[in-house]
Amino acid sequence: MHKIIGPGKIKDTLHVMHLFVIECDKRDELQRFLKEEGIGTAIHYPMAIHQQPAYKGRIRGSNELYWTENLYKRILSLPMYPELSDNEVERVCSALEKLFNDLSHRI
């Protein structure tokens, strides 16, 4: 869980940032930790798109998409909304920093 990957940037585009989705190998542990810190998170995509009923039979080729299936198990949405104050952003960042500091002392 020592590594979190944030949203990427694509040249010459702007992101609306309605979701702030990160990747983490130990997503469920991270989510539990943040909940204990009073920080809500969400798993907006509990299954890969090609596995959802609405897309059944609509995907050409193999119905197994390794990278997609691997990724959806690792993504977690952190708080992101217009009313989120700078103090709340700082609280989320501090909780993540606390987690990484705790982990680094255990190694």
Residue ranges and their predicted role:
Residues 1-107:
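PLP-dependent aminotransferase class I/II
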